[in-house]
């Protein structure tokens, strides 16, 4: 959700900070309109979206709003159709272990993960999708990071180091 983003933006600017506005969204495995429960952890995937400019902020608000209005099923969900429609001005990160790319990697499905990463790069454009490295000392995460490094070398998709933090 993006509640409070305007107050946050104004206060950051007042303090001389250039804020980066964004949101972690839930991506439905198929359509945001689906109301069927899929098994296990694959009910939705995490994806980080950051507004690159004013157009990106406008598109981000549309994506998030439509996730609530059209895709709400236990959680507000978006889908790749929506991301394709409103991708301009948005930078996307592959997210944590709950992201689609990482989920495939933890299941040993490297080629499917790579295909998914390339699909996100196609949606957001080269230079606007990043593979997200995190290290919280979790063995599974360290394994995923090694595979993301390999994927970077094979695809040229850039890496970004982050931490799984949430601002409320």
Predicted regions and their residues:
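Phosphodiester-processing cores and adjacent nucleic acid-binding clamps
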Residues: 1-168
